Amino acid sequence: MNFTVTGLTVETKGMTSEQLEDAKLFSGKNAGICYMGDSYYDSAVTDPIKATKRFVNTCNNGHHSIADHVRIEVLLEGSSKMLAIVLNSLQDYATSEKSGRYTIMTGNSERETVLYDKWKEIFHNRIIELYPTYDDATLLKKFEKKYPESGYAVRCGKLIELEANLDVRTDMEANNYFRDVIKADTTLPSWKMAQENARYVLSVFTYSTTFGYSTSLRQWNYIYDWCQKYINQFAPQYDMDYIKWERTNGKKGKCVLLSKFTGIEASYFETRLYFDLLKLSNFIYDNMYVEELRDNKNRCFEFLTTLSGVEDHPMKGYDLSCYEPDGYTGDFNYTPDTRSSDDYFGLTYNTSYTASFVHIAQAERHRTLKYFMFFNPNLSEHEFFVPPMLLGTDYVEEWLSDLNSVKDLIPQATKVCIVETGHISDFILKCEERLCGRAQLEIMQQTSITASKFLEDVDSGAITNKACINYVEKLRGESGKIKTKCKMLSCKEGCVWGSKNALTRLI
């Protein structure tokens, strides 16, 4: 048995027509493996002319998987979060995205930016109020880097002298340094967490997301087709408005899109996504388009369900009525225990819940599971996620009021309905990542809720499949409660919560 590397991803800046031809040639060589009589290198498989012809013929016969051997990475800078969410819903990809926790974000409008700065301060103060020791370890580390063996400790964000190891002058300098430099450092954990929560007020179409996205030559061409399927459900009302709006990235004028199905004006959400997908599809067409690699299964961006361009999407039939507001009061009355009549838990499962755009952006990183979004952008009122650290305070009303003031821009706190489906073995993998003190809070809480429903159905006898029960028992801790990541795996990451507090924290 022999092993030989035949292909390798290399770094490049831009893609030339020659590189695209090389990609097609390599795919054509792989197509020849299926029927070669001799070895790979000593046969007609690697003949350039035959390989090129073979690529075209194989693709025209509908066998496109040969183009999956070529992986192409695109760096998207200044992208919207929504475009990243759509691309990350496709499962066949690798992505590296600049984190909202470690990045000071800016909104598209002054309204968003003002709210982001305001809530970043509020969240920071609230974090320190709830967890006064949250920054202590980092504060001490930074202090000791300049003043080692100083005899000081840090407790609740304050310097505490344990031993008088410094002379009077140095001691004064050290205290001033701690107060004026270290305590003002916006890279402290509390500030990073504040930034992570403040991004909820920014539009899902805030163009400050940067990520590298890798997938195959085939998939890039399918993405082009799915972009076109979304785009082709709309038509600009006036061509000149469309041109002006497109050239200025939506900063000048207004472009009105009309649905070809209903004649109704497209919402802000639909219009922004239209231009995002238009720009992406234009880039693909200019750099990676291969005529023979058209999607021959008539698919779409399944994640978008009824917004995908498929007028009567099959997932439209999933019962989500339990998440609708009360017809009289307008209140949302569902609880974490709420289940749709279509939810099912077994070896394969499907479950529904509501989630913010921030949450679903995290959830999609579990690529072995599939997610479907249900969102009506034309509703006059939307539900918003409220960070648990605000619950029970006067901030809740202010938070909701501020979000309502920018609701037309679709802030990332906007909640949508999600249907999650997959195999329980893959859900276990999700639990091993997300039932953790380091995981984003909203997805950690929902993962815990879904795990609890599996345990409930085993305990009640609703799940009888022995294989499924064996998987579910992996989630059960010694006390019968849900295990955390550090109890399921040998976790080496630093964490201030531990297994005891990971699932009950408020930040």
Where does each model-flagged region fall?
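A conserved ligand/cofactor-binding region detector
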Residues: 1-507
